[in-house]
Design a protein with these regions (language model features):
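Conserved, well-structured ligand/cofactor-binding cores
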Residues: 1-477
Length: 477
C-alpha cells in the first residue's frame, strides 16, 4: 500500500491474524487487520483521516473504555495509562495519517474500529517502552477493545463526532444568516417588484427579500440543534447485540460517565440497548435536517441567479461579484458560479439523504450493517454544506450590490400596482384596468385618471410604492 504521507524505511514487522501472516512496514501504527481492510476496500478513496472529528471521537471512546476497565480491575493500570496517553495524543491531532481505511466498507464498521484499536495499541506499546507489534504488552482486541464490540464503540464514536460536526455546521449557517441580515438592512430602502409564478405581483423592498432569506435559514439552526440532541443517547456496554455479553454489569454506566467528562457532552445510556444497537432513527432525522437546509440554500441560490440575470436582457436587479470569466467562446460573459456550485452541493446532499434512508431500511434483525455508508453520507454532507455556505457568504453575499434604478423602474412600469386599487375600485374594475394597461401599454396611474376613477391626490397616496410594502389602513379611514 502506498500512503505518501507516511515515509517508509523499508523495514517491516510480521503480524498475523486468523487468516495468516503479513509483513507490515515498520512505520505503520496500524496492523494486519487494517491492512486487510485497505486491500479489500478501494471504494470511495475517502479515508477516515478525511474526517478528523471521527478520529477524535474514536479516541474519546477508547479512552473512556480504558478508564472504566481500569476502575473495574479488568485492565492493568500501566496498560490503561498508556492507552489513555495514546488517546490523548490522537485527540491532539497526532497520527491522523495512520487512519487509512476507506469510509465505505463492509463489516458494519469493524475495519474502522480495528484501525483505531491497532493504532492506539501500537502507540501505547511505544509509551510502555516496547516495539510496535509486540502485542503481549498491549493488544488491540484484548486491551484496547476490552468490554467492547464494533457495534457499540463505532456508533458511539460516530454520534460524538456528529455532534461536534453539527455544531460547526450551525456556526457556519449562523454566519451566513448574519450576512443576509446585513444585506437586508443595506437594501431596506430599495423598492422592487415582488413576483409569484415568475409574474409581477406586488411591490416590496429588496431588503425584505434578503431578510426573508435570513428568516428562512434561521429555522434550520433551531431544527439542527434540536435534532443533534438525539445523538446524546449512546449504547456503550451493549457489546455485540445489546445484551452486554463480555461486559461487567457496571461497565456501561461507568464508561458513559467517563465519556461525559472527556467530551463535555450530556451523554446518557440508552434505555434499551438492543433497540439502540440496531436502530438508525437518529441518523435518518439528522440526514433529513441536512437535506432540508440544502433545499432552502438551493432555492435561495436559484433566486440569486434569477435576480442577477442579464445584465441587459434579464431582471438585473442585483449584481453578484464577478469571480471568473464565464465562457470560452462568449467574450465578456460572467456567470453566477457561486450560487451554481451551492445548487450542486444541495443536489449531492439530497442524494445522500436518499442513500441514508435506503441503508437504514436495509437493517436486519439486531444490527444494521450498512452504517458505514450512512456515516460517510452524513459526514460528507456536513463537510460540503459548511464549505458551500462559507464560500457563498465570503465570495458572493458580502459583495452583492443593488441596481436601485432598475428595481424602481420595474415597479412603476408594472401592472402589479393595480392590486393596491382593489379596496377602492373593486376586483372587477381593477382587472379591467390591468387588461387595458396590458393591451395599450399605458400605465395604471394614467388609466385611473383617464377614467376619472380617483383624484390625483388620492391616487398618488394609494399607488405610492413605499405605502404598499406593509399592512396599512385604507386611505380615508
Amino acid at each position: 500500500m502506498d500512503f505518501t504521507e507516511i515515509r517508509l524505511s523499508g523495514k517491516t514487522r510480521r503480524e498475523h491474524d486468523l487468516l495468516g501472516e503479513m509483513e507490515i512496514p515498520a512505520e505503520y501504527y496500524f496492523g494486519v487487520q487494517t491492512m486487510r481492510a485497505v486491500e479489500n476496500f478501494h471504494i470511495s478513496h475517502v479515508r477516515l483521516n478525511f474526517f478528523p472529528e471521527l478520529i477524535r471521537a474514536l479516541a474519546d471512546v477508547k479512552q473512556g473504555a480504558a478508564m472504566a476497565n481500569r476502575d473495574l480491575g479488568l485492565l492493568d493500570p500501566a496498560i490503561a495509562d498508556a492507552i489513555i496517553r495514546a488517546c490523548e495524543e490522537l485527540r491532539a491531532g497526532k497520527l491522523e495519517e495512520q487512519f487509512v481505511v476507506d469510509m465505505v466498507q463492509g463489516g458494519a464498521g469493524t475495519s474502522t474500529n480495528m484501525n483505531a484499536n491497532e493504532v492506539i495499541a501500537n502507540r501505547a506499546r511505544e509509551l510502555l517502552g516496547h516495539e510496535k507489534g509486540e502485542y503481549q504488552f498491549c493488544h488491540p482486541n484484548n486491551h484496547v477493545n476490552l468490554s467492547q464490540s464494533t457495534n457499540d464503540a463505532y456508533p458511539t464514536a460516530v454520534r460524538i463526532a456528529l455532534v461536534r460536526s453539527i455544531e460547526k455546521l450551525v456556526a457556519s449557517l449562523r454566519e451566513l444568516i448574519a450576512a443576509f441580515h446585513a444585506k437586508g438592512e443595506e437594501f431596506s430602502g430599495i423598492i422592487k417588484m415582488g413576483r409569484t409564478q415568475l409574474q409581477d405581483a406586488v411591490p416590496m423592498t429588496l431588503g425584505q427579500e434578503f431578510e426573508a432569506y435570513a428568516a428562512n435559514l434561521t429555522e434550520e439552526t433551531e431544527r439542527l440543534t434540536a435534532n443533534m440532541k438525539l445523538f446524546f443517547e449512546i449504547n456503550m456496554g451493549a457489546t455485540a447485540i445489546g445484551t452486554g455479553i463480555n461486559a461487567d454489569p457496571d461497565y456501561a454506566g461507568l464508561c458513559t460517565r467517563y465519556l461525559r467528562e472527556i467530551t463535555g457532552l450530556p451523554l446518557v445510556e440508552a434505555s434499551n440497548m438492543i433497540e439502540a444497537t440496531s436502530d438508525t432513527g437518529a441518523f435518518i432525522m439528522n440526514s433529513s435536517a441536512q437535506k432540508r437546509l440544502a433545499v432552502k440554500l438551493s432555492k435561495i441560490c436559484n433566486d440569486l441567479r434569477l435576480l442577477s440575470s442579464g445584465p441587459r436582457c434579464g431582471l438585473n436587479e442585483i449584481n453578484l461579484p464577478p469571480r471568473q470569466p464565464g465562457s470560452s467562446i462568449m467574450p465578456g460573459k460572467v456567470n453566477p458560479v457561486l450560487p451554481e456550485v451551492v445548487n450542486q452541493v444541495a443536489f449531492r446532499v439530497i442524494g445522500n439523504d436518499l442513500t441514508v434512508t435506503i441503508a437504514s431500511e436495509a437493517g436486519q434483525l439486531e444490527l444494521n450493517v450498512m452504517e458505514p455508508i450512512i456515516v460517510h453520507c452524513l459526514f460528507e454532507s456536513i463537510e460540503m454544506l459548511i464549505n458551500a455556505m462559507n464560500t457563498l457568504r465570503e465570495k458572493c453575499i458580502a459583495g452583492i450590490t443593488a441596481n436601485e434604478e432598475v428595481c424602481r423602474r420595474m415597479v412603476f412600469n408594472s401592472i402589479g400596482l393595480v392590486t393596491a386599487l382593489n379596496p377602492y375600485l373593486g376586483y372587477e374594475t381593477s382587472s379591467m384596468l390591468a387588461k387595458e394597461a396590458l393591451k395599450t401599454g399605458k400605465g395604471i396611474y394614467d388609466l385611473v385618471l383617464e377614467h376619472k376613477l380617483m383624484s390625483e391626490e388620492e391616487l398618488h397616496k394609494v399607488l405610492q410604492p413605499e405605502n404598499m410594502v406593509h399592512p396599512r389602513k385604507k386611505i380615508g379611514e
